[in-house]
Amino acid sequence: MLADRVLVYFEDARRFYEEALKEFEEGVRRGDPYKVRDAAEKAWNAVVQATNALLLKLAGKLPSSHWERRRMLRELEAKMPEVRALMLRDRYGVREGHLHEMVFYEGVVDVEDIRYELGKVRAYLDDVGKLLGVGT
């Protein structure tokens, strides 16, 4: 069932976000930059999974790449004013740049910036949850 798969992806997003928060706090407490970087990657994956849920529900298809997610979000924004108003495509790209590329791959560990980004991930999940009709 499509609806079940949508919920599985969104639940994965929530779980990855919760794990990211735990791992981030543990990494900060221990002074472990690798834990913090892993937390950023989990937070990024929360965005990816939430986006998968949204695209599966609204477009009826799962994207096969980050590029395809951005394209599908752009197409949804063109068709749906409520999606366009949330600027999800832009937000998706920014989280990718900050969490996935800068923190995880490049190793830029600015604790306060990452904490700020984690809040942005939460807001993204909240907005996607509203579009899906599920709470976060």
Where do the language-model regions lie?
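Long, charged low-complexity segments
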Residues: 55-136
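Hydrophobic alpha-helical packing segments in soluble, helical-rich domains
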Residues: 36-60
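Non-transmembrane, amphipathic alpha-helical segments
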Residues: 5, 31, 35-39, 106-109, ...
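Residue-level recognition of hydrophobic positions within alpha-helical transmembrane segments
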Residues: 19, 34-37, 41, 45, ...
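Short linear functional motifs in flexible/disordered or boundary regions
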Residues: 25, 32, 51, 58-59, ...
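Charged, amphipathic alpha-helical oligomerization/scaffolding segments
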Residues: 12-19, 42-45, 116, 120-127
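Charged alpha-helical initiation segments
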Residues: 1-34
